[in-house]
């Protein structure tokens, strides 16, 4: 079974600050026996992230609008592919991650299978509140949607373990 993982890339002012979080969550998913659609969120800088994107997508177009469009289309293609679940780390604001989340929870409206979604948010990491576009999604309205706050990376990996166990 494949899992999509998303987290802030462009919006993260210093990717190295959150790299260990993304790496730990990705390792937990893989350790539970799931394959990853792609792992670029763990890149610590632009070049490493671009290299990881290249591994996931194949050769990237040169920097510029063609690459931007290519990457956007591939991300949406992955969200709309044959995945079993999607996990998002949403502690850092990201328009791209928000679009990925929207495509994931709107899959049924696109004629695609509904999948379980997990949003992880580190309490107090970002000075502003989480967008109501994410926090406003409720389990009552979207039963497959799981929003969980955590205080430590150990707590986040524990939440993720529980989520993955429910998939089996």
Regions found by a protein language model. Give the residues of each.
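Conserved catalytic or regulatory cores that recognize and/or transform ribose-phosphate-containing ligands
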Residues: 1-168
């Amino acid at each position: 079974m494949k899992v999509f993982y998303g987290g802030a890339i462009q919006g993260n002012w210093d990717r190295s600050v959150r790299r260990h979080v993304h790496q730990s969550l990705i390792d937990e998913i893989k350790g539970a026996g799931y394959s990853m659609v792609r792992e670029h969120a763990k890149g610590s800088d632009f070049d490493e992230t671009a290299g990881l994107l290249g591994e996931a997508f194949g050769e990237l177009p040169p920097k510029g609008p063609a690459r931007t469009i290519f990457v956007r289309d591939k991300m949406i293609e992955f969200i709309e592919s044959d995945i079993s679940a999607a996990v998002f780390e949403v502690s850092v604001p990201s328009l791209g991650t928000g679009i990925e989340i929207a495509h994931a929870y709107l899959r049924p409206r696109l004629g695609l299978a509904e999948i379980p979604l997990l949003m992880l948010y580190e309490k107090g990491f970002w000075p502003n509140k989480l967008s109501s576009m994410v926090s406003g999604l409720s389990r009552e309205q979207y039963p497959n949607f799981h929003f969980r706050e955590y205080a430590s990376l150990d707590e986040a990996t524990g939440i993720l373990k529980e989520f993955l166990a429910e998939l089996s």
